[in-house]
Structure formats: structure tokens, C-alpha cells
């Protein structure tokens, strides 16, 4: 009887341990299910939970996907303004870079006009000589300016320049040559003077890019060295 009681007590303890382990396992599973359900409930709106059914579109996973997509679209729409601002800044920087590149590609030569040293642009892309209003003011040539006679005629000019007046006799000293040539006055803030193709042809000019020289004349040739474009704006500012 004594041994039987020991066996019975041992079997009861084993049974209790198994039941306790089973209860712990059930509690863990219940907690896991509650956690998953709570996590989904936190992500889903209450109206979405009420409408859950057998349809695939009303399952938690699909509702979450739709909500996530709507949130991303909303963020994308709200982010369009700063993106547009970045694009504008990028375009502005690109425009400034192109302008600087154009200035670096200019061919400049030193000359004299109205007793002042001037950097003139050798412009083979324009037929006419051009001088800006700013350059006219700087050189004191206002009294030589006349109204543009051919108002109905639109000159072919680069960079969408607008002719406002003209100078019939613009005296320019280029090397040892003294030129008396017409020039169109353009509405431009830059203090530029440019020699057009018409004048360059009359001087029988050759542009030597290897030697960086403007060669004038056919028999008695004269070479005018190019001017560095880097100092153009600084020279214009100091001369103003």
C-alpha cells in the first residue's frame, strides 16, 4: 500500500506538470493572437474593422495596402512644391552655367572708342555692329545716337536683342586701323561692343584660333591678340 501511494502521488504530480505546461502554452498562444489582432486593429480604422467580411477587398491585408497607398500619394502631392523649387533652382543654375559658357566662348579684342579702351566682341554670328545702351552711356556717345530709321525692318540679331537706336558713324581704332562704321544700339544691360560680319569682311579678317589672333588685311597684315574673357566683366566695371 505504501508503494502504491507513492506511485499514485508521483503520477498526480506528473499530471499536474503536464496540465500546467498545457495551460502555459494556451496562454502564450492566446497572447500571441491578441497581439496580432491588436496590432492590426491599431493600423486599421474602426470603420474598416466593422466592414470586414469574406470578400478579399475587405480583408485586413488589403485594407492596409490601400491605406498605405493613399498615404504615399498624399505625401507625394504635398512634396511637389519643394520639388518644384529644387527644379527651379536647378534650371537657374543651368542657365547661369550656359551664360558663363557663352561668355567663355567669346572672342574679344582690344580697341579704342571715344578715347576709351574697350573690349570688343568678334561676332561672326551677326551681320551688324552692335553697341549696348550701357556702353553708349559709359563712352558718352549719346549725342551721336539717332533714331532707328528702319523701324519696320527687323534685323537678324542673336540672343533676341532689340534695336532701339543707331549710330551712323562710330569711330573705332583697332590696332593701327581707324574705322568709321555704323552700329545698331541695342537694349542690353551688358556693356558690350561687337564687330559684326559685315565689318570683319571689309577688313579681310581671319580668325586664327591656334595663335589666338585676329588677322586683318590681305597684303599688309596686322595681328590683334585675343583678350582673356575672364577679365571682361571686371574691366567693364572698372571702366564704368
UniProtKB/Swiss-Prot annotation:
Pfam families membership: Asp_protease
Highest taxon of the lineage: Eukaryota
An annotated Gene Ontology molecular function: aspartic-type endopeptidase activity
GO BP terms in the entry: proteolysis
Database matches in CDD domains: NRIP_C
SS bond partners: none
Protein name: Nuclear receptor-interacting protein 3
Organism: Pongo abelii (Sumatran orangutan)
